Each structure stands twice: as structure tokens, then as C-alpha cells.
């Protein structure tokens, strides 16, 4: 064998060895650390299967006995009689309901669709001009000075889908010039802790709204028909969003980047939005419970009528805020 051939053989062996080493490094990625006990404690139960074959049957129905729910649980359909204090459940098989006739009720938008729309009763431009010229209601001095911080500055893995920076909201109008989310520092840090625990379980937090300037709350009120005022906060009292101590959010799946399925859409105005709504699928209710557990563990309380809305425990300590996003220190 010639020396040149020997050098070529050695060079080829080095190249092959390097390629094999690179492949080994690519495939032998370190496994993710096991979730901590505090993260595992958030799990409501073992995660149920999606049971998509039942989705078209799950819902609310009218019957001679009143409104009943057809829900999915443990890969079976159940009829839930809400008129009973105990919410009696019956396995949904033909022999179990006898002659009871039920008719499906259409109660809200389909999952993943745009939410309900309310036609503004006044020009949004006029409402905005008046709201910007108005002042929040007077209050006693607050216990704490405002300290608004941006959630994504504290944790860049938190995702934003700020609905009021788009037209996909109940009034179909952009209210924010920028898609940003601020909260008072203790509340923001609590959201970050919840997100970090959830990430250990394969989920992250997706923010729909956080601090909301008071003038936007006044715009909601002035643009909404009187018979729909129950949908929005009264600017005469302000809201916890105005105080920077409330957040609207959901979960997203880290593997897909998509929001998880919940019993209702965001900002839905039906009973499906209630935090303890009994309907839906096992997985929808499990997702809702996981979000609630994560937020409650960090000092938040869920709004009983909105599964996505959480108020921080010290919201009373902060004043109603009216500063726009662009005037908050970056």
C-alpha cells in the first residue's frame, strides 16, 4: 500500500468518525428534567383522551324536564340533569332515558371560531375621543404605588394573543395600538411562576389581556348596547384589569404551539364560560382545571363566570390606572 493511499484511508476514517460523532450528538439529546413535585401537584388527574368521536354530541339540550347536558367522561356519554341539586348523571344509552325527548340548543360559537359580536351603538372614534378626555373615578389613596412590568420581559416564553389589539373581540374594533401585556410586579411574577411550572408539564400560558387602561373600559361601556352592559365593567367603578391585577389567559401546548381546547371560547357570554360549567368533554374540563390549579397556586382567584379571568389576591392595593401602553417605561 502506498503512503498516499494510506493517508487517504486515514483521512476518510477521520471524516466518517466525525460524521458519526455528530449524528450521535444529534440523537442523544439530554432528556428534559423530571417535573418538580410542585408542578406535578397541579395535575387534576391523569390526562384523559381527546374522545373526538363524541364532540358532535356533547352539548346542551332542551327537554320536557328542562335543560340537560350531554357530556363526555371516561370515553362515555352521560346525560346530566342540571335541575337536580346533585346534578344527577345517567349513562347515555337508549334504555336509560326511556321516552325523554331532547333537542340540541345552540348556545355559543364553535370552538376556535371568532367570539360573539356586539354592534357598537356609537362611532368608536367618538367614543375613544370622549374616553381619552375623561378621568377615572376618584378613590382613596392606594396602599401601593403602581409598578407595571411587561410579562414577556420577565419571561419570554409566555405567548401573547392580545385580542383587543386586533378586531377579533366582541366589538370588532382595535382598542390597543400594541399587543403587549403588563401587570403589577407581584402579580406578573406570580404569572411567571405559574408558567414555569406548567412548562414542566408540557404547557405554557397564552395571554389574551392583562392591564387595561381605564379609558378602554369606558370605551367598552359607551359603545355597548344597554341590554349588553352586563358583559363589561362599569367605568364608574373600574375593573381589576384597570388596576393591573387581573389577567385573561389560557394554555397552549408546547409540542404544537396551539391553544388547548376549553369548554368555551374566550370572552364567550354563555354558561359554557362559567368556571364550574359541567358540560364539555373530559379533556376540556381537565385543561380548564389545570389552568385554574396553576393560577390559584400562585395567589389568583378565578372569576366564577369566566374561566379565563384571574384576579390577583392583592388587587385592592392598587389604584385604577389610565396610562396607555406607550407611556409605560419599556
Predicted regions and their residues:
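N-terminal secretory signal peptides that target proteins for export/translocation
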Residues: 1-9
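N-terminal export leaders
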Residues: 10-15
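Hydrophobic h-region of N-terminal signal peptides that target proteins for export
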Residues: 18-26
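Peripheral terminal and inter-domain segments
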Residues: 26-134
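K/E-rich alpha-helical interaction surfaces of small helical-bundle regulatory domains
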Residues: 54-67, 295-299, 306, 311
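A mature extracytoplasmic/lumenal domain signature
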Residues: 74, 83, 96, 164-166, ...
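Extracytoplasmic cell-surface/polysaccharide-interacting catalytic and binding patches
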Residues: 116-208, 223-305, 314-330
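Beta-rich nucleic-acid/ligand-interaction surfaces
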Residues: 214-217, 310-317
Amino acid at each position: 500500500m502506498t503512503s498516499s493511499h494510506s493517508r487517504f484511508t486515514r483521512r476518510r476514517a477521520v471524516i466518517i468518525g466525525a460524521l458519526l460523532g455528530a449524528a450521535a450528538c444529534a440523537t442523544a439529546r439530554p432528556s428534559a428534567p423530571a417535573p418538580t413535585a410542585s408542578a406535578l401537584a397541579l395535575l387534576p388527574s391523569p390526562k384523559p383522551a381527546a374522545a373526538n368521536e363524541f364532540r358532535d354530541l356533547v352539548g346542551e339540550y332542551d327537554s320536557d324536564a328542562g335543560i340537560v347536558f350531554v357530556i363526555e367522561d371516561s370515553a362515555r356519554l352521560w346525560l346530566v340533569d342540571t335541575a337536580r341539586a346533585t346534578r344527577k348523571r345517567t349513562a347515555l344509552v337508549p334504555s336509560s332515558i326511556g321516552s325523554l325527548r331532547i333537542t340540541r340548543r345552540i348556545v355559543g360559537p364553535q370552538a376556535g371560531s371568532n367570539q360573539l359580536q356586539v354592534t357598537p351603538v356609537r362611532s368608536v372614534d367618538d367614543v375613544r375621543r370622549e374616553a381619552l378626555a375623561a378621568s377615572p373615578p376618584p378613590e382613596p389613596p392606594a396602599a401601593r404605588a403602581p409598578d407595571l412590568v411587561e410579562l414577556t420581559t420577565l419571561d419570554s416564553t409566555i405567548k401573547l394573543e392580545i385580542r383587543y389589539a386586533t378586531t377579533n373581540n366582541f366589538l370588532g374594533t382595535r382598542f390597543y395600538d400594541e399587543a403587549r401585556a403588563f401587570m403589577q410586579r407581584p402579580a406578573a411574577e406570580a404569572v411567571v411562576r405559574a408558567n414555569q411550572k406548567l412548562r414542566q408539564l408540557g404547557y405554557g400560558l397564552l395571554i389574551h389581556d392583562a392591564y387595561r387602561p381605564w379609558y378602554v373600559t369606558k370605551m367598552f361601556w359607551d359603545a355597548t348596547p344597554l341590554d349588553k352592559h352586563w358583559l363589561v365593567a362599569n367605568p364608574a367603578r373600574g375593573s381589576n384589569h384597570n388596576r393591573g391585577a387581573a389577567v385573561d389567559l389560557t394554555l397552549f401546548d408546547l409540542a404544537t404551539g396551539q391553544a388547548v381546547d376549553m369548554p368555551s371560547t374566550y370572552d364567550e357570554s354563555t354558561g359554557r364560560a362559567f368556571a364550574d360549567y359541567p358540560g364539555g368533554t373530559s379533556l376540556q374540563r381537565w385543561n380548564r382545571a389545570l389552568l385554574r390549579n396553576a393560577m390559584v397556586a400562585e395567589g389568583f382567584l378565578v372569576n366564577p363566570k369566566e374561566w379565563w379571568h384571574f384576579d390577583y389576591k392583592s388587587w385592592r392595593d392598587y389604584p385604577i390606572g389610565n396610562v396607555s401602553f406607550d407611556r409605560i417605561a419599556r
